[in-house]
Amino acid sequence: MGNETSAHERAAALLGEHPGYRVLRALPPLAAYPITEPQGHVRTAAVIDVETIGLDADHPIIDLAIQRIAFDARGVIVQVGQPRQWFEDPGMPIPAEITRLTGITDADVAGKRIDVDEAVSLIASTTVAIAHNAAFDAPRVERRLPTIAGHAWACSCNEVPWPELGFDGRKLGHLLMQQGMFHQGHRAAVDVWATINLLGRVLPDGETALAKLIRQAEHPSVRIEATKAPFEAKDVLKARGYRWHAEKRTWWTEIATAREAGELDWLRDACSCTQPKLTPVTWAERHRG
């Protein structure tokens, strides 16, 4: 086996040196993950992923995975815990398209339940929960585990400036490929491990993606709702990056607090919006819709 592995590595190295080829490697097993000695203050995170029976907020979870990591003042991962994963019976048939996407069948989840006490303990004892698209995971996890409501969350998809770092897109699998890795996605435990590997990689500027994520996520921001903006302003607001909140029937955005004054000036001048609603946001409130 050792000789075969060495031969494969030599072949991969040879291909990797050729401009006409790109070599992708499978994610390493947990035992092979590189760990270094911590420097400075150490904090913890729970990396989380869920699979559900659909995209609606009230669609039940069928697959939950949590894996704890510890990271130091540099944003370097210095410890990786064992993954925990649970199936849960949604009480209804899993749609065929979800089974095609995830491979999870009715038989896999029949009679299964999430260990709520263990899941809550794993999350609540950390500094922050991390998910790749936390706006999807956070409200669904808090709905299933209400005692962790108000825990800090960070989003590795949207709170890391991937395009500015030279990456094309934000999808987990695509980001991995641009780092020379691949995984079989759409299972909670696999996606969690992929997220950990993505965040732990040192980027060309010498920092990890995790360092950038934590720095961005822990800073407060402000949610601006363009209340009473005229209907005619909708295209301008959309082009600016505002999103439509169907329930509140208003356009909204979330920006760094340092940009607040300039944004209010823009709303007044470009949209005749003089009474926007401002809500301070920390990582304990963010990603809840």
Predicted regions, residues:
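Residue-level "edge-of-site" marker
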Residues: 112, 189, 250
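Short secondary-structure capping/turn micro-motifs that flank functional sites
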Residues: 115, 192-193, 253
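Short Asp/Glu-rich motifs
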Residues: 118, 195, 256
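Conserved non-catalytic scaffold segment of RNase H-like nuclease domains
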Residues: 2-151, 158, 165-185
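Active-site catalytic microenvironments for nucleophilic, acid-base chemistry
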Residues: 144, 178, 198-205
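Acidic, divalent-metal-coordinating active-site segment for phosphoryl/phosphodiester hydrolysis
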Residues: 190-198
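Acidic two-metal-ion nuclease catalytic site recognized across multiple nuclease folds
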Residues: 1-36, 201-289
